C-alpha cells in the first residue's frame, strides 16, 4: 500500500513562546478548553504509554481531571497498565486534537490516588459502569462474551442499588516532569514549545520542528 501522497499542510494557527503561559498546566487547561469549545471528538482521550523490561505498550484512556498537580485517570489496577505502573511508574501521555492541528506530549510519574478520591469518583459513575468494573477481569482471556453477560446479570442482582468500589479499581495521578505543546505549521515547520521541571521550577524553550 503506497501512502506517500497522504499528507496535510497545517495552516490554522501558530504558537508563540511569549504567549505561552509560564505554567504548562495552565497552558494545557487553556488548550483543553479550546478543544472542548471547538467540539473536538473525544478531547479528553489520551494515549498512555508504559514500559516493562524495555518493552513499551500503549493504549487510549480518558483524562478525568486536571489540576496543578497533574493528570488524573481511573482504571483497573490489575490491568496491563496497572501492572506496568506498579513495576515502572514512569509513563508518557499524548493528546491529539486534529481539528485544531495540535498535540500535547507529557512525561511523568504515576502514583495511586487516595482510596477516598477513588471512592468519590467511582460513586459518580453510571450504574452500568460500576457493575462493569466488577464484571471485567480486564486484560484477561475471556472464554466467551456470554460469560461476561452472565456475570453482569449476577452482579446486577447482587448490587441492585449501591455498588461498592472494587479494591482493584481506582485512580492515578500523573505528575508531569516534561510537557510539550505542538502546533502544526506549513511546510512542516511546526511550532514546538517544551517545558521541563528543573528543581521544582518550569523551564520553557522552543524546539526545532
Curated annotation (Swiss-Prot):
Parts of the chain that traverse the membrane: none
Cofactor note text: Binds 1 FMN per subunit.
Record-level Gene Ontology MF annotations: FMN binding; pyridoxamine phosphate oxidase activity
Residue sites binding FMN per the record: 59-64, 74-75, 81, 138-139, 182, 192
Identification of the protein by name: Pyridoxine/pyridoxamine 5'-phosphate oxidase
GO BP terms, alphabetized: pyridoxine biosynthetic process
Catalyzed chemical reaction(s): pyridoxamine 5'-phosphate + O2 + H2O = pyridoxal 5'-phosphate + H2O2 + NH4(+); pyridoxine 5'-phosphate + O2 = pyridoxal 5'-phosphate + H2O2
Pathway: Cofactor metabolism; pyridoxal 5'-phosphate salvage; pyridoxal 5'-phosphate from pyridoxamine 5'-phosphate: step 1/1; Cofactor metabolism; pyridoxal 5'-phosphate salvage; pyridoxal 5'-phosphate from pyridoxine 5'-phosphate: step 1/1
Gene responsible for this protein: pdxH
Pfam families: PNP_phzG_C, PNPOx_N
Subunit structure: Homodimer.
Record-listed E.C. numbers: 1.4.3.5
Binding site for substrate: 7-10, 64, 121, 125, 129
UniProt KW Cell membrane keyword: no
Disulfide bond sites: none
Amino acid at each position: 500500500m503506497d501512502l506517500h501522497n497522504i499528507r496535510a499542510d497545517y495552516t490554522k494557527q501558530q504558537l508563540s513562546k511569549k504567549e505561552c503561559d509560564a505554567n504548562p498546566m495552565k497552558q494545557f487547561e487553556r488548550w483543553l478548553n479550546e478543544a472542548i469549545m471547538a467540539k473536538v471528538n473525544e478531547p479528553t482521550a489520551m494515549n498512555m504509554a508504559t514500559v516493562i523490561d524495555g518493552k513499551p505498550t500503549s493504549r487510549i484512556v480518558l483524562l478525568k481531571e486536571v489540576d496543578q498537580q497533574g493528570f488524573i485517570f481511573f482504571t483497573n489496577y490489575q490491568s496491563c497498565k496497572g501492572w506496568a505502573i506498579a513495576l515502572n511508574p514512569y509513563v508518557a501521555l499524548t493528546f491529539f486534537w486534529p481539528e485544531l492541528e495540535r498535540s500535547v506530549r507529557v512525561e511523568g510519574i504515576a502514583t495511586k490516588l487516595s482510596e477516598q478520591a477513588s471512592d468519590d469518583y467511582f460513586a459518580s459513575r453510571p450504574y452500568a459502569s460500576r457493575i462493569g468494573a466488577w464484571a471485567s477481569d480486564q486484560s484477561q482471556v475471556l472464554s466467551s462474551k456470554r460469560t461476561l453477560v452472565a456475570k453482569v446479570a449476577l452482579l446486577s442482582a447482587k448490587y441492585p442499588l449501591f455498588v461498592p468500589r472494587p479494591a482493584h479499581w481506582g485512580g492515578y495521578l500523573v505528575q508531569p516532569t516534561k510537557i510539550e505543546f505542538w502546533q502544526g505549521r506549513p511546510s512542516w515547520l511546526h511550532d514546538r514549545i517544551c517545558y521541563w521541571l528543573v528543581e521544582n521550577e518550569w523551564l520553557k524553550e522552543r524546539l526545532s520542528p
